[in-house]
Amino acid sequence: MGGVIHSDDKNLYFSSGNTDKILYQMDLKKDKISKLKLKEINPQQILPYKNKLFVTHCDLTSGMGKAISLLNPQTGESKVYKFKHNVIQCQTKEDYLYILSNDSIYKYKFDGEKMHLEASSKIAIKGFWKNGYISSFFLK
């Protein structure tokens, strides 16, 4: 298992790290694991958003993947958001979604239904090593 883990008061969510379309949900009181089917492959990062979960879809080896699912874990329903850029990592803050791609960072306003691009910026670091890349970020 090489995926990412998220937990709340009742459940632990994790992916296998494989190219499947499955997110696993473990009921912490019953020690029961169930599968939540997704519409996209490569589930990676799992972020809480209100009573739902954002799930990024990216092959971290190639840096390719342009989708994020918004999953309702109670019903199993999900909606896929497709982007013109790769989704390497993302963070949420209030109703904003910040997405790191291969060479840029994007700020989207999420109104519960649609993603609205508010800003984007290319990442250029002087003196950066020749074959290096930005692999993560955090919000304060």
Question: What is each stretch, according to the model?
Answer:
Residues 8-9, 16-19, 29, 49, ...:
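Short loop/turn segments that connect beta-strands within the blades of beta-propeller domains
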Residues 20-25, 62-69, 104-109:
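Structural motif
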Residues 31-38, 76-82, 116-127:
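A short beta-strand motif characteristic of beta-propeller blades
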